[in-house]
UniProtKB/Swiss-Prot annotation:
<dbReference type="GO" id="GO:0044233">
    <property type="term" value="C:mitochondria-associated endoplasmic reticulum membrane contact site"/>
</dbReference>
<keyword id="KW-0472">Membrane</keyword>
<keyword id="KW-0407">Ion channel</keyword>
<comment type="similarity">
    <text>Belongs to the chloride channel MCLC family.</text>
</comment>
<protein>
    <recommendedName>
        <fullName>Chloride channel CLIC-like protein 1</fullName>
    </recommendedName>
</protein>
<dbReference type="GO" id="GO:0034707">
    <property type="term" value="C:chloride channel complex"/>
</dbReference>
<dbReference type="GO" id="GO:0042802">
    <property type="term" value="F:identical protein binding"/>
</dbReference>
<feature type="modified residue" description="Phosphoserine">
    <location>
        <position position="429"/>
    </location>
</feature>
<dbReference type="GO" id="GO:0032469">
    <property type="term" value="P:endoplasmic reticulum calcium ion homeostasis"/>
</dbReference>
<feature type="modified residue" description="Phosphoserine">
    <location>
        <position position="459"/>
    </location>
</feature>
<feature type="modified residue" description="Phosphothreonine">
    <location>
        <position position="476"/>
    </location>
</feature>
<comment type="function">
    <text>Anion-selective channel with Ca(2+)-dependent and voltage-independent gating. Permeable to small monovalent anions with selectivity for bromide &gt; chloride &gt; nitrate &gt; fluoride. Operates in the endoplasmic reticulum (ER) membrane where it mediates chloride efflux to compensate for the loss of positive charges from the ER lumen upon Ca(2+) release. Contributes to the maintenance of ER Ca(2+) pools and activation of unfolded protein response to prevent accumulation of misfolded proteins in the ER lumen.</text>
</comment>
<feature type="modified residue" description="Phosphoserine">
    <location>
        <position position="521"/>
    </location>
</feature>
<feature type="region of interest" description="Disordered">
    <location>
        <begin position="361"/>
        <end position="410"/>
    </location>
</feature>
<feature type="compositionally biased region" description="Basic and acidic residues">
    <location>
        <begin position="364"/>
        <end position="389"/>
    </location>
</feature>
<feature type="transmembrane region" description="Helical">
    <location>
        <begin position="185"/>
        <end position="205"/>
    </location>
</feature>
<keyword id="KW-1133">Transmembrane helix</keyword>
Length: 539
């Protein structure tokens, strides 16, 4: 009985709870709340009597709240859709850019990536942009529908010719245009400039070829000396670095500090063994600079050796190749005569070159003018000294010739010079007529062959020039013309005289020919011509 009562009470309670809970109807678009998943409580449960009790203001507020709630739910749904769409968008674009960056790293890895030693590196690449690639990039940037595969192919074809950055890229362009290294072009232009300067300044006409070649050899030797010293220094420095790398195992052994026991042990071991001390070699490499291993004398010796032996090496190499090619097609029995003929040809060439050495001076440039033979009038002035004002640092062959005294000449000197030049010209032309030929026009060697005549006392008539202030040995133009006429008139009578008298007269005139010499003797003139003496050009 009690059990039945308990069962009835439980059923009543269950039915009461079931009446409170609403039935969930998803098809009810008005009362079903999709956000919470429950049914809204309806206000129509109490019957028509309760609906009549609700005021119209409360119903409008409930409708407004429902609209706001729905708006919030819709906004939340839109945001969730946008986020989902962005995730899908990123999931499609990330692989494209991942592959693009991976390609850049692969191309840069071939040339070298930055590390601890090189913080940053620069690379150069060419960008190839086609029309299809441009359209795919524009679609991606504008947010239109795009295809990941097409964009991936477009980005993969953009970068080509990936290479390291070079700050001297202009050299590449220069070589592409001209096909020549700029350094070689500079050296060729420098040589052309030297040739232009040599020709334009006419140095080759002022300086002898022998002097030019000598200077070229000296300059080449000095340049080779500096060149060989730098080469030897670099070789010594490289050897020094290699020795330091080989002494690396002794760093810990030789660099540590030793006390007196360690130094004593080192001395004991070095005294009882013939092995070299590695620490000595180690400290020599650390202290001695390689520059002290290349003295100038070593560079000088090597330069002189190369200056002499290098040309001989090339000559010997060429001669060996020539003999090898010559003997290749000649039978063995004829090789010995051919070698003998070659030896004779070389000896004859050397002999001919030695004989032709004196002839080479004609190619050395303009020779100096040989000393001119002294004319009879010049022997009268042999007390005058020549002085030369050289120019051109020993290369130019010009000088100024004049007397040892004052450079300026007086009127008598100019007159005497004009007379001397006219007479010398007639003498060399072969015109030896009695009208122009004088004793002072003959060479001294011819005059010395005649017997000497003892001169007599000077005539007082011949010293009138000294009293009037004129120079001895000179006469006025009037006296010279009169004397010439007198002599021309006396030539027939002189032709009848004996040869001995003529020679004596020539000897006497030649002795009076120098300036300031003795005047002709009156007795000698009378003995020669039988008439009174007249003025002569020499006195």
């Amino acid at each position: 009985m009690l059990c039945r009562l308990l069962l009835c009470e439980c059923l009543l309670l269950i039915t009461g709870y079931a009446h409170d809970d609403d039935w969930i109807d998803p098809t009810d678009m008005l009362n079903y709340d999709a956000a919470s998943g429950t049914m809204r409580k309806s206000q129509v449960r109490s019957g028509t009597s309760e609906k009549k009790e609700v005021s119209p203001d409360s119903s409008e507020a409930e409708e407004l709240s429902d609209c706001l709630h729905r708006l919030d739910s819709l906004t939340h749904k839109v945001d969730s859709c946008e986020k989902k769409k962005m995730k899908d968008y990123e999931s499609q674009s990330n692989p494209v850019f991942r592959r693009y960056l991976n390609k850049i790293l692969i191309e840069a890895g071939k040339l070298g990536l930055p590390d601890e030693n090189k913080v940053e590196m620069r690379y150069d690449a060419e960008i190839l942009l086609s029309r299809q690639t441009l359209l795919e990039i524009q679609k991606f940037l504008s947010g239109e529908e795009w295809k990941p595969g097409a964009l991936d192919d477009a980005l993969s074809d953009i970068l080509i010719n990936f290479k390291c950055h070079d700050s001297e890229a202009w050299k590449w362009q220069f070589e592409d245009y001209f096909g020549v290294d700029p350094y070689n072009v500079f050296m060729v232009l420098l040589c052309l400039l030297c040739l232009v300067v040599l020709v334009a300044t006419e140095l080759w006409t002022y300086v002898r070829w022998y002097t030019q070649m000598k200077r070229i050899f000296i300059i080449s030797f000095l340049l080779s000396l500096a060149w060989n010293w730098i080469y030897l220094y670099k070789m010594a420095f490289a050897q020094h670095q290699a020795n330091i790398a080989g002494m690396e195992p002794f760093d810990n052994l030789c660099a540590k500090k030793m006390d007196w026991t360690g130094s004593l042990w080192e001395w004991f071991t070095s005294s009882w063994t013939y092995k070299d001390d590695p620490c000595q070699k180690y400290y020599e490499l650390l202290i001695v600079n390689p520059i002290w291993l290349v003295p100038p004398t070593k560079a000088l010796a090597i330069t002189f050796t190369n200056f002499v032996t290098e040309p001989l090496k090339h000559i010997g190499k060429g001669a060996g190749e020539f003999i090898k090619a010559l003997m290749k097609e000649i039978p063995v029995l004829l090789q010995i005569p051919v070698l003998a003929i070659l030896a004779l040809a070389v000896l004859s060439f050397c002999y001919g070159a030695g004989r032709s050495v004196p002839m080479l001076r004609h190619f050395g440039g303009p020779d100096r003018e040989p000393p001119r033979a002294l004319e009879p009038d010049d022997r009268r002035r042999q007390k005058g000294l020549d002085y030369r004002l050289h120019g051109g640092a020993g290369d130019a062959d010009f000088s100024y010739r004049g007397p040892a005294g004052s450079i300026e000449q007086g009127p008598y000197d100019k007159m005497h010079a004009s007379k001397r030049d006219a007479l010398r010209q007639r003498f060399h032309s072969g015109n030896k007529s009695p009208e122009v030929l004088r004793a002072f026009d003959l060479p001294d060697t011819e005059a010395q062959e005649h017997p000497e005549v003892v001169p007599s006392h000077k005539s007082p008539i011949m010293n009138t020039n000294l009293e009037t202030g004129e120079l001895p040995g000179e006469s006025t133009p009037t006296e010279y013309s009169q004397s010439a006429k007198d002599v021309s008139g006396q030539v027939p009578s002189a032709g009848k005289s004996s040869p001995t008298v003529d020679k004596a007269q020539l000897k006497t005139d030649s002795e009076c020919s120098p300036p300031g010499g003795c005047p002709p003797s009156k007795e000698a003139a009378v003995a020669a011509h039988g008439t009174e003496p007249v003025s002569s050009p020499c006195g």
